[in-house]
Amino acid sequence: MRFDREDLSQFVGKSFIYNYDKGWRYELYVKNRITIDYRVHSGIVAGRWVKDQTVCLARVGENLYRVSWTEPTGTDVSLTLNLHDFVVHGAIYFPRWIVNNPEKIACYQNEHLEEMEALRDAGPIYPTEIIDSFATLIYMRDCGPDNEQVISCPPSELPENYPFCLPDKNLLPESAATE
C-alpha cells in the first residue's frame, strides 16, 4: 500500500465547496476526525446547514477520502472526495418524506433536532430516493481543525460572490477553480 490509511492530516481542517452536476452547491468542513459541518447553497434542500454532524472518515487512496453519515432526518450520505482530480462523488439516500417535502429540512438543523426526529419517525421512509451524482470542487481551503467560524451562518447571509470573496487562499489550481 502506497499510503497510510490512518493519516487524515491532509483532510481534517479542510473546507470544500463543490457543485453537483445537477447544479446544486454544497459546502463541507471536515472539522475533525469524527465531525463535519456543512451547508447547502442550492438544490432541493437549499438553506439547510448543520454543525457537529458525527461521521465516519476513511482515507481510501493517496488523495482519496470517504465521508459517511446518517442524519437525524433518516438521510444517509456517503461522499468520496478525490483531491487529485478535484471531484466529489455523492450518494445521498433521502427518505420519502424529504422528497415529498424538502422544505421541511431547509433550516439550521441543530435548532430543530427533535422536530427532525419526529418527522423521520412519522415517515414515510420508503421508497427511498437515491441521488447518485458527481460534483466538481470549486474551492478548497485550510481552516484548521475545530474552527467554529467556518460554517457559522445560513447560506442566505453570505455575500453574493462567496466563496471567491474569502481572504483564505483557494488551494485548488486556477484551472480547477471555475464557477
Give residue ranges: language-model regions:
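Tryptophan-anchored aromatic micro-motifs
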Residues: 1-25
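Alpha-helical transmembrane segments of secretory-pathway, organelle, and plasma-membrane proteins
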Residues: 19, 23-34, 105
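A short, structured loop/turn motif at beta-sheet edges
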Residues: 58-63, 84
